[in-house]
From Swiss-Prot:
Changing N147A: Severe decrease in UTP binding. This is Terminal uridylyltransferase 4. InterPro entries: MTPAP-like_central, NT_sf, PAP_assoc. Changing S188A: Severe decrease in UTP binding without affecting RNA binding. UTP binds at S54, S65, D66, V67, D68, G144, V145, R146, N147, S148, K169, K173, S188, Y189. Changing R121A: 2-fold decrease in affinity for UTP. 660-fold decrease in affinity for RNA. Its cofactor is Mg(2+); Mn(2+). The gene is TUT4.
Length: 333
């Protein structure tokens, strides 16, 4: 017998005591942003620096968490609804500008540890010891800015729903489901899409067309969004958590349906041609793509954010969803 919503809520609120006692204001990010912006200007004064990721989505920053930055040129910003090029040429241009930026950062901040990572899907510069905040920098990619702005637009509609998202994100890392953990398969971004999709299906949020998000109208460093403690000793949070788990265990049909914010209502695998035959065809072309747990990216065409979920990992996910129901996302032993 699963615990009641009240018990789940109290347990989760208790588990976040240390988190809410911290200074979660984004002012810590502001200082680092200005230092990095100074380095960007030294490379190219016309370049813009944007923040994306959880700091933008939630409007808070926990000390010790990494921050994501991206450098964009004037054309990227003016064409704020344009798609990101995924060619090898584009990847090379990203790596080149990041190499220049990495050199400037090393010159201006001798104590910072700067690592250039080229052999990834997206080239990135990773910086540790960046003042109070560690950060990653990518280049010429608007999708991260648009994704984060879209998710923030949803959470601004109903700010307390951030607690559901943060609870699911933390649980996903504890269970090893999160791609940030070795063996994990769904990114924090993917779990955020799952949370917002669930909230839309329950009419807790109003649909936001992804096409309305324009980088030219997004603030490079969005302001802090105060985070109030869950009301009613977490009763609403406990209710949402149990219903989220029930939804993905018993209502969402992973064999036929796609988690999608691209359009209202239900999206099917058949509509997107995310079928077993498409999976087999991709494998014949050397691509490791799975359509077992489908999460459609709002901006990157034909991208399944859940592409790393194999049949085995889908079963693993379901077992953890069942266990989460009985343990209040592992907060009740």
């Amino acid at each position: 017998m699963p615990p009641s919503p009240a018990v789940v809520g109290r347990s989760l609120v208790n588990s976040f005591k240390q988190f809410v006692s911290k200074d979660l204001h984004t002012r810590h990010v502001d200082a680092t942003y200005r230092l990095v912006l100074d380095c960007v200007a030294a490379v190219d004064p016309l370049m813009r620096l944007y923040t994306f990721g959880s700091t933008v989505v939630y409007g808070v920053h926990e000390k010790g968490s990494d921050v994501d930055f991206v450098v964009l040129n004037k054309t990227d910003v003016e064409d704020g609804k344009g798609g990101d090029a995924a060619t090898q040429v584009a990847k090379g241009l990203q790596a080149d500008i990041l190499a220049k930026l990495a050199r400037v950062i090393r010159q201006k901040h001798l104590s910072w540890n700067v690592e250039e990572v080229r052999r990834t899907r997206v080239p990135v510069v990773r910086v540790k010891g960046g003042g109070a905040v560690d950060f990653d920098i990518t280049a010429y990619r608007r999708n991260g800015v648009r994704n984060s702005a879209l998710l923030r637009a949803y959470f601004e509609q109903n700010p307390p729903c951030r607690w559901l998202s943060m609870s699911i994100k933390r649980w996903s890392k504890q269970t090893g489901l999160n791609a940030s953990v070795i063996g994990g398969s769904i990114t924090s971004y993917g779990f955020n899409l799952m949370v917002v999709y669930y909230l839309l299906q329950r009419n807790h949020l109003q649909f936001v067309p992804p096409s309305t998000i324009d980088v030219s109208r997004v603030e490079p460093l969005p302001p802090h969004l105060p985070l109030e403690e869950p009301a009613d000793e977490g009763l609403e949070l406990g209710t949402q958590v149990l219903d989220f788990l029930h939804f993905f265990l018993h209502e969402f049909d992973s064999d036929k349906q796609v988690i999608s914010l691209n359009r209202p209502g239900i999206t099917t695998k058949e509509e997107l041609d995310w079928t077993k035959s498409a999976e087999d065809f991709a494998r014949m072309n050397g691509e490791k793509v799975h359509y077992q747990w489908c999460i459609e990216d709002p901006y990157e065409l034909n991208l399944n954010v859940g592409r790393n979920v194999t049949p085995l990992k889908r079963d693993f996910l379901r077992r953890h969803l069942e266990k989460a129901r009985d343990t209040a996302l592992l907060t009740i032993v």
